Amino acid sequence: VLLIISTIAFTGCFSSGKKSDDKNTVTVFNYGDYIDVSVLKTFEKETGIKVKYEEYVTPEDMYTKYKSGVINYDVICTSDYMVEKMMQEGEAQKIDTSSMEYYKNIDEKYLDFCKAFDPTNEYAVPYLWGTVGILYNTKVIKEKVDSWSILWDKKYDDQIVMQNSMRDAFMVPLKWNGISLNTTSQKELKQAQS
């Protein structure tokens, strides 16, 4: 069995344009299982600020729920491309990092990565860095796996699972075909679909 593992290429947290009204509560929207409940409890104990923590599965799910306006979020943790989209739509607020003691300890390379979607580093704070890869059971797959091509090998039909991520579903075939992961060419995107 093959498993495509993907951790978000780059995840940033940003302050949404729709803040909650309660000054003693911070409403956070993040991927499921990304922050342990004990961390939230420790934060509440140390600061006296209550955390209302909401989870989502994919950035697209997050976007749909956010845009519905049902809940106003103070902090949203999502992927790089979604931060950029929401900035372009005016849905993100600038973050004052001067009061964040740890901000000066963030390695410059991560702040530089953020500049790809937040050129002035004013809207997002680096949160997670991840990767995409292939995990496989060596008892089932005997040959060495060193290429994305194994995903299209007929002998492994119905034995491959992939994370529920629209972006990753396109990223893998684009990468395999030597196409930029950020292409906007309809021809290249259709090639990735086939």
Label each region the model flagged:
Residues V1-I4:
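Sec-dependent N-terminal signal peptides
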